[in-house]
Swiss-Prot record:
Enzyme type, top EC level: transferase
Gene this protein is translated from: glyA
Organism phylogeny: Bacteria, Pseudomonadati, Pseudomonadota, Gammaproteobacteria, Alteromonadales
Organism expressing this protein natively: Shewanella sp. (strain MR-4)
GO CC terms in record: cytosol
Cofactor(s) annotated in UniProt: pyridoxal 5'-phosphate
Catalytic activity from the UniProt record: (6R)-5,10-methylene-5,6,7,8-tetrahydrofolate + glycine + H2O = (6S)-5,6,7,8-tetrahydrofolate + L-serine
Role of this protein: Catalyzes the reversible interconversion of serine and glycine with tetrahydrofolate (THF) serving as the one-carbon carrier. This reaction serves as the major source of one-carbon groups required for the biosynthesis of purines, thymidylate, methionine, and other important biomolecules. Also exhibits THF-independent aldolase activity toward beta-hydroxyamino acids, producing glycine and aldehydes, via a retro-aldol mechanism.
Protein name: Serine hydroxymethyltransferase
InterPro entries associated with the record: PyrdxlP-dep_Trfase (IPR015424), PyrdxlP-dep_Trfase_major (IPR015421), PyrdxlP-dep_Trfase_small (IPR015422), Ser_HO-MeTrfase (IPR001085), Ser_HO-MeTrfase-like (IPR049943), Ser_HO-MeTrfase_PLP_BS (IPR019798), SHMT-like_dom (IPR039429)
PTM annotation (N6-(pyridoxal phosphate)lysine): residues: 229
Length: 417
């Protein structure tokens, strides 16, 4: 018999210590990776529930196993809340990740070898938008579009490429683009050539849910997202649509199950349901508004200190600091900041002369620092410290001073108070 007082600490101290150390790291480090966030204890409670024991292949009301009456309630709650949150008429909450949600869309809408227009990874796209090392680049004929000299998406080039190559699907969305995407313009281009418009809104889903970034759901045939990042839920994926096309919805459902996955992770779906409910609350909108304010405040300081920001600013939660021309690589900047308990990620920038393993940029995002309570004053102070390190990245004294300042700031703003 399993006893409720069983615990990891006594049974597996090695694992427990790793978990404890990660908990401490999150509290004592400032998290600036744009794709990371802190989920609520309510979400973690759902994920740690006995729902993890239940197999539920199929969809609510159409399962291949018995005993699914309660997990049907859980999944239906998640579906209806996701639809309400984004103004969709269809939602699939089963994808285990954003990448698996994306692969389901490819499977539902395309055949191997079909032409796809996607954002160049080096210009801010994502691996699943056509990178040659990813399934998308291996199975499909990818035509990349990018940004212009100002750092903004070049819609004229996009239209020219679309007319020339006539892709069956166009992809909107990004992993390192700080501007606002014109979803309506993209749909116009897609309609002009008879293509599907598929939008991956993973990075800005929380901003969209709060109404502080344009919603692609009314414009795209299909939209996917992760449920973490700005949405601040559990790690997972969703697929949405407002196309009012039952045939499309059936194809999407079939591409998830049985096409790409077996049993859904019901404990994670419960966590998604909680996160969607939280995102419908008024305070979530205030949080997302602050995310953007903090990002703009950080950009202001970077520019004042003489650092180049790709596109010259930000209209969302992230920014890309361009280090081309400086005697500092993205990899070195990442390591130096990490030594001061500031976590970022090295990132390629447009026309980057260095390899993706070294890079000439760092990507910075504000969802996590905003979640722990930072406002513009803290964001600006932090950016000053970052610039101090980037100015003198090989000086241990500077790194040690900033680390002390970081620890003091983290103590003032605990993640979980």
């Amino acid at each position: 018999m399993l006893k409720k007082d069983m615990n990891i600490a006594d049974y597996d101290p090695e694992l427990f210590n790793a978990i404890q150390n990660e908990t401490l790291r999150q509290e004592e480090h400032i998290e600036l990776i744009a794709s990371e966030n802190y989920t609520s204890p309510r979400v973690m409670q759902a994920q740690g529930s006995q729902l993890t024991n239940k197999y539920a292949e199929g969809y609510p009301g159409k399962r291949y196993y018995g005993g699914c009456e309660y997990v049907d309630v859980v999944e239906t709650l998640a579906i209806e809340r996701a639809k309400q949150l984004f103004g969709a008429t269809y939602a699939n909450v089963q994808p285990h990740s954003g990448s698996q949600a994306n692969s389901a869309v490819y499977m539902a809408l395309l055949k191997p070898g079909d032409t796809v227009l996607g954002m160049n990874l080096a210009h801010g796209g994502h691996l699943t938008h056509g990178s040659p090392v990813n399934f998308s680049g291996r199975l499909y004929n990818i035509i990349p579009y990018g940004i212009d000299e100002s750092g903004k998406i070049d819609y004229d080039e996009m239209e020219r490429l679309a007319v020339e190559h006539k892709p069956k699907m166009m992809i909107g969305g990004f992993s390192a683009y700080s501007g606002i995407v014109d979803w309506a313009r993209m749909r116009e281009i897609a309609d002009k050539i008879g293509a599907y418009l598929f939008v991956d809104m993973a990075h800005v889903a929380g901003l969209i849910a709060a109404g502080v970034y344009p919603n692609p759901v009314p414009h795209a045939h299909v939209v996917t997202s992760t449920t973490h990042k700005t949405l601040a839920g559990p790690r997972g994926g969703i697929i949405l649509s407002a196309a009012d096309d039952e045939d499309l919805y059936k194809k999407l459902n079939s591409a998830v199950f049985p096409g790409g996955q077996g049993g859904p992770l019901m404990h994670v779906i419960a966590g998604k349901a909680v996160a969607f409910k939280e995102a419908l609350e008024p305070e979530f909108k205030a949080y997302q508004q602050q995310v953007v304010k903090n990002a703009k405040a950080m950009v202001e300081v970077f520019l004042e200190r003489g650092y180049k920001i790709v596109s010259g600013g930000t209209d969302n939660h992230l920014m890309l600091v361009d280090l081309i021309g400086r005697d500092l690589t993205g990899k070195e900047a990442d390591a130096a900041l990490g030594s001061a308990n500031i976590t970022v990620n090295k990132n390629s920038v447009p026309n980057d002369p260095r390899s993706p393993f070294v890079t000439s940029g760092v990507r910075i995002g504000t969802p996590a620092i905003t979640r722990r309570g930072f406002k513009e004053a803290e964001a600006k102070e932090l950016t000053g410290w970052i610039c101090d390190i980037l100015d003198d990245a090989h000086n241990p004294a500077v790194i040690e001073r900033v680390k002390g300042q970081v620890l003091a700031l983290c103590a003032r703003f605990p993640v979980y108070g």
